[in-house]
């Protein structure tokens, strides 16, 4: 995991340490066994030790993740050498945003984008900690860069860290949010790239948004 985190940082992508899944053991209190919460399912316990964690293995370790996240390869290497089991968190809204849709909708949208000549950037498949369906993550050019501070705008699609748990439809990860990066594991298997990052500039989010929104709408029919 360390070498991959270093590669992300070397590409200029902000990274920070993420929680990981670990084997759950029985937990007891003086009143007997603790109630089993969502984060206590066998094989899906979060390393944060938060009872009923809504996103086991899929959030930063530190509450100060927005301050600590960075793209220094040396620092990233040191972090993961010290905590080799940590998942990789990519912070959005600085270098890139992420359009996050159900995997089936993402596949349908991809099939339509190519004939239409719409260029996509990196696309990842991310299993969800507490949901049966995977999510497709489309990496796009950010609209929340600091250079655009005076013109930054929000919309109802914006996704924030509190928006944990299974959510249908389209989510837009921008400033103040994050995603779990391949090959981190936060569900039944590890996240993976469908289309790996390359040298080409990231696409404009609005070019992809129509296709993704239509695919999500059709999936609800």
Predicted ranges, named:
Residues 138:
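Catalytic core of tubulin tyrosine ligase-like
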């Amino acid at each position: 995991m360390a070498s991959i985190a270093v590669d992300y940082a070397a590409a200029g992508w902000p990274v920070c340490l993420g929680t990981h899944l670990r084997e759950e053991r029985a937990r007891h209190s003086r009143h007997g066994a603790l109630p089993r919460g969502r984060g206590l399912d066998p094989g899906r316990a979060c390393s944060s030790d938060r009872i009923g964690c809504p996103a086991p293995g899929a959030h930063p370790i530190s509450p100060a993740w927005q301050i600590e996240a960075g793209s220094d390869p040396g620092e990233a290497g040191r972090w993961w050498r010290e905590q080799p089991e940590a998942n990789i968190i990519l912070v959005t809204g600085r270098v890139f945003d992420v359009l996050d849709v159900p995997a089936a909708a993402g596949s349908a949208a991809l099939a339509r984008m190519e004939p239409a000549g719409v260029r996509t950037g990196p696309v990842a498949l991310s299993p969800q900690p507490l949901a049966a369906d995977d999510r497709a993550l489309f990496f796009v050019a950010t609209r929340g860069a600091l250079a655009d501070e005076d013109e930054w705008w929000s919309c109802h699609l914006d996704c924030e860290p509190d928006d944990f748990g299974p959510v249908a439809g389209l989510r837009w990860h921008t400033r103040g949010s994050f995603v779990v990066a391949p090959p981190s594991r936060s569900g039944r298997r590890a996240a993976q790239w469908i289309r790996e990052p390359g040298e080409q500039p990231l696409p404009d989010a609005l070019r992809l948004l129509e296709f993704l929104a239509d695919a999500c709408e059709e999936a609800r029919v």
